[in-house]
């Protein structure tokens, strides 16, 4: 029997995630959105590409949560973008309401699913999804680090003039300006990245990575990134459905790791069929720990705002 993946939110990130997943033939895909016709149209369009691209998976669009029942993975991309004049608190409230609505309807229909959150503010929305679903924390995770690491790896490859395939990089922390790229744990085919790139240039690359999402928003003028976020999400879905035991940074629930408790936070994990199968604790130095704690403080502030609403 084929696996089933439900994607809630048929916007750019949701529909592009469906595209990457179909190309990988990971399972049948259900694309759900509240707007009538949009998920149906996008799903049909994608499904009609299957004879050309040769993927044998069904892609269906719906407005009905009943069609998501018995999913193996649920991906949540639904959320409102920040509009001019909107405070951070306003955005948190709007997206919290959307997340509650999505999870409260989808989770009971797929009690054994792994939930992957892709909406912002990522760490807080993942915390909320875990709370609303009642799922074991290891089966509710956030996609941020895979995308941020991909951007970091891209910039390192561009600077060093090497294949992106040979760049391995790790970063931690919250998604956004407070992320913590870790040059010390970044290599090119096992060779420390510092052998290729001078410290001042590496510092600039770290800063560009932190602002990676904003850079694309500024270039597009309307909208935000979706190819890379969707590809990152598809990679996580693949790790779960194929039980690949991939080592990747995801927003996971911490219970004392890195001195942090009761928080969803970007850390390296082993990702497999059970979701987060192990959280890896890296031997961080004082400077790295200071950056990590500052990042945790920012994530905690967002979480406190969410809890106060």
Swiss-Prot record:
<feature type="binding site">
    <location>
        <position position="151"/>
    </location>
    <ligand>
        <name>substrate</name>
    </ligand>
</feature>
<dbReference type="Pfam" id="PF00056">
    <property type="entry name" value="Ldh_1_N"/>
</dbReference>
<dbReference type="InterPro" id="IPR001557">
    <property type="entry name" value="L-lactate/malate_DH"/>
</dbReference>
<protein>
    <recommendedName>
        <fullName>Malate dehydrogenase</fullName>
        <ecNumber>1.1.1.37</ecNumber>
    </recommendedName>
</protein>
<feature type="active site" description="Proton acceptor">
    <location>
        <position position="175"/>
    </location>
</feature>
<feature type="binding site">
    <location>
        <begin position="9"/>
        <end position="14"/>
    </location>
    <ligand>
        <name>NAD(+)</name>
    </ligand>
</feature>
<comment type="similarity">
    <text>Belongs to the LDH/MDH superfamily. MDH type 3 family.</text>
</comment>
<dbReference type="InterPro" id="IPR022383">
    <property type="entry name" value="Lactate/malate_DH_C"/>
</dbReference>
<feature type="binding site">
    <location>
        <position position="120"/>
    </location>
    <ligand>
        <name>substrate</name>
    </ligand>
</feature>
<feature type="binding site">
    <location>
        <position position="82"/>
    </location>
    <ligand>
        <name>substrate</name>
    </ligand>
</feature>
<keyword id="KW-0816">Tricarboxylic acid cycle</keyword>
<dbReference type="InterPro" id="IPR036291">
    <property type="entry name" value="NAD(P)-bd_dom_sf"/>
</dbReference>
<dbReference type="InterPro" id="IPR015955">
    <property type="entry name" value="Lactate_DH/Glyco_Ohase_4_C"/>
</dbReference>
<feature type="binding site">
    <location>
        <begin position="118"/>
        <end position="120"/>
    </location>
    <ligand>
        <name>NAD(+)</name>
    </ligand>
</feature>
<dbReference type="GO" id="GO:0006099">
    <property type="term" value="P:tricarboxylic acid cycle"/>
</dbReference>
<feature type="binding site">
    <location>
        <position position="95"/>
    </location>
    <ligand>
        <name>NAD(+)</name>
    </ligand>
</feature>
<comment type="function">
    <text>Catalyzes the reversible oxidation of malate to oxaloacetate.</text>
</comment>
<dbReference type="GO" id="GO:0004459">
    <property type="term" value="F:L-lactate dehydrogenase activity"/>
</dbReference>
<feature type="binding site">
    <location>
        <position position="33"/>
    </location>
    <ligand>
        <name>NAD(+)</name>
    </ligand>
</feature>
<feature type="binding site">
    <location>
        <position position="88"/>
    </location>
    <ligand>
        <name>substrate</name>
    </ligand>
</feature>
<keyword id="KW-0560">Oxidoreductase</keyword>
<dbReference type="GO" id="GO:0030060">
    <property type="term" value="F:L-malate dehydrogenase (NAD+) activity"/>
</dbReference>
<dbReference type="InterPro" id="IPR001236">
    <property type="entry name" value="Lactate/malate_DH_N"/>
</dbReference>
<dbReference type="Pfam" id="PF02866">
    <property type="entry name" value="Ldh_1_C"/>
</dbReference>
<dbReference type="InterPro" id="IPR011275">
    <property type="entry name" value="Malate_DH_type3"/>
</dbReference>
<dbReference type="GO" id="GO:0006089">
    <property type="term" value="P:lactate metabolic process"/>
</dbReference>
<keyword id="KW-0520">NAD</keyword>
